[in-house]
A protein has these predicted regions:
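Hydrophobic ligand-binding cavity/cleft-lining segments
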Residues: 1-60
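Beta-strand/loop substructures that line and gate deep hydrophobic ligand-binding cavities in soluble
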Residues: 81, 90-139
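Intrinsic-disorder/low-complexity, polar/charged segments enriched in Ser/Thr/Lys/Arg/Asp/Glu/Gln
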Residues: 2-8, 51-53, 75-77, 88, ...
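A generic structural micro-feature
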Residues: 1, 48, 68-74, 95-99, ...
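Acidic, low-complexity intrinsically disordered segments
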Residues: 141-151
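Amphipathic hydrophobic-ligand
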Residues: 34-37, 69-76, 97-104, 137-138
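Glycine-rich portal/gate segments that line the openings of hydrophobic small-molecule binding cavities
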Residues: 41-92
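Short, highly charged C-terminal tails/helix-capping segments
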Residues: 150-160
Length: 160
């Protein structure tokens, strides 16, 4: 079962200021831990004036159709590729479940701030219950993205 989710946010800081915070390991860790991560590590793969690539490894409690399972832990890896010239972030998630998650986020300057357009593609490779899982994942993005953008703005305000 495949599904897409898209949202736009108007932010009170420049695209560069927001991008700098979205790449900040402290923000990445805070964001992941706000969603229940037990351990978070960020490893740079490549960084120059044109692009920045890194992996985010997260250890969290297991998840199933009924929710969190504290008797087991799961590891997931998100590979992030920034095109710094276009302020575009592309990411791919891989984990313990038959789920493919990819996304693209684009920052543009607008007025005295910026706009962040976020999108994710969800593909659940589970027969029968895949539709339910995809719906829960989509709802998770819709619930968490506003919280994430608020956190990014809080981090940007500390730097201003």
């Amino acid at each position: 079962m495949a599904s897409d989710v898209r949202m736009k946010f108007d932010l009170g800081f420049s695209a560069q200021a927001i991008r700098d915070q979205m790449r900040n390991p402290a923000l990445i860790e805070a964001s992941e831990k706000s969603r229940g991560a037990l351990e978070v590590s960020v490893r740079d793969l490549h960084s120059d004036d044109e692009r920045h690539e890194y992996e985010i490894t997260v250890v969290s409690y297991g998840r199933g159709i009924k929710g969190e399972n504290r008797s087991k832990k799961e590891t997931s890896v998100t590979t992030v590729k920034w095109d710094l010239g276009t302020n575009t972030r592309r990411w791919t998630w891989s984990g313990a479940h038959p789920v493919d998650l990819t996304g693209e986020d684009v920052l543009t300057d607008s007025g005295s701030g910026s706009t962040l357009a976020m999108s994710a593609h969800i593909n659940v490779r589970i027969p029968v219950v895949g539709r339910v899982v995809a719906k829960k994942l989509k709802e998770g993005f819709e619930d968490n993205w506003p919280k994430y953008t608020k956190l990014v703005e809080e981090f940007a305000a500390k730097e201003a």
